[in-house]
A protein has these predicted regions:
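Short, charged/polar "capping" segments at the starts of alpha-helices
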Residues: 51-57, 169-172, 200-201, 220-221
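Short acidic loop-to-helix transition motifs that present clustered carboxylates
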Residues: 76-79, 194-200
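Short, small-residue-biased leader/transition segments that mark boundaries at the very start
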Residues: 1-3
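A conserved acidic, glycine/proline-rich C-terminal tail/linker
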Residues: 193-196, 210-215
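A polyampholytic, Gly/Pro-enriched intrinsically disordered region
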Residues: 42-45, 89-102, 142-156, 212-218, ...
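Peripheral docking tails and interdomain loops at the edges
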Residues: 10-11, 19-23, 129-133, 217-256
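Conserved, well-structured core segments that form the ligand-binding/active-site neighborhood
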Residues: 8-140
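Redox- and metal-dependent alpha/beta enzyme cores, enriched for Fe-S-associated oxidoreductases
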Residues: 110-189, 197-205
Length: 256
């Protein structure tokens, strides 16, 4: 077990404890070799905490094949180099200028999808469970089409519900009040909804034309089909109001 004296955002405690559990052993490089032909020369390595111990060996393996590897240092929201959270992509953005694409070590799209949307560079997933690799471009493009459709649907909305989380690490009341003021500047009505659990069934029955989510950034992405009204990220709300263009689209993050 290790502890950190650094305060984390929105936490009630100044001292946070991390239980450092060992990850699974790295048995084979088959899944890395499956990804290697899809990789550019300069690659940023990314993963979750489960596979973080594999990164040095994978880095050495790819460097022997001629790749230049970068592993981004963590910020105050993550503990390990190369680690991704669903709402924090610092270890990817900090090396963005030094790489031409990314290799994510893990299963599923949840963590690397945010990087693929945030940064216009290839993201390849190397899946150690299946022993396979794939490009995330098709999934990224599908999600961006969904986001564009949500923005278009919200263009004529007059009343917005701005969702604010009470959860530690997700509370962004300052952002929510700024967005409310921005809506009113453009002649729209906006009301704040302070919630512990954000779920579509808890938001039914309100006279709201569209939702703006300042809680976990992935709610608008992962749960979009569960909401009758369009649900936007803060940056998408700025596009609806004309404060930002689609060409300046960025993925929402919770950062220190």
């Amino acid at each position: 077990m290790c502890s950190s004296d650094l305060p984390m955002p929105h936490l009630r405690y100044n001292r946070v404890f991390f239980y450092d559990l060992p990850g699974p052993p790295l048995g084979s490089m088959t899944f890395i070799d499956a990804a290697e032909p899809m990789l550019p020369k300069r690659v940023g390595l990314l993963t979750t905490t489960q596979f973080r111990g594999w990164l040095p060996a994978i880095q050495a393996h790819l460097e022997k094949k001629g790749h230049v590897i970068r592993i981004g240092e963590p910020d105050r929201r993550v503990a390990y180099a190369g680690q991704l959270l669903g709402c924090d992509y610092h270890t990817a953005t900090v090396v963005e200028g030094d790489v031409d694409g990314y290799l994510y070590i893990g299963t599923g799209d949840f963590h690397p999808l945010g990087v693929a949307i945030l940064i216009d560079k290839p993201v390849i997933i190397a899946d150690p469970e299946r022993g396979t690799a794939r490009d995330l471009k098709e999934v990224r493009d599908r999600v961006l089409r969904q986001r564009h459709a949500a923005i278009v649907r919200a263009q004529d909305a007059r009343v917005f519900g701005i969702i604010v989380s009470k959860k530690i690490g997700q509370a962004r009341m300052g952002m929510a009040t700024d967005l409310k003021a921005l809506a009113e500047k453009h002649g729209r009505q906006a009301n704040l909804f302070l919630m512990d659990l954000v779920a579509p069934e808890l938001l039914q029955g309100y006279r709201v034309d569209a939702w703006v989510n300042t809680a976990c950034p992935r709610i608008a992405i992962e749960d979009i089909l569960q909401y009758k009204q369009p649900i936007l990220t803060p940056q998408e709300f700025e596009i609806v109001l004309g404060e930002r263009t689609w060409n300046d689209y960025v993925f929402d993050e919770i950062r220190v």
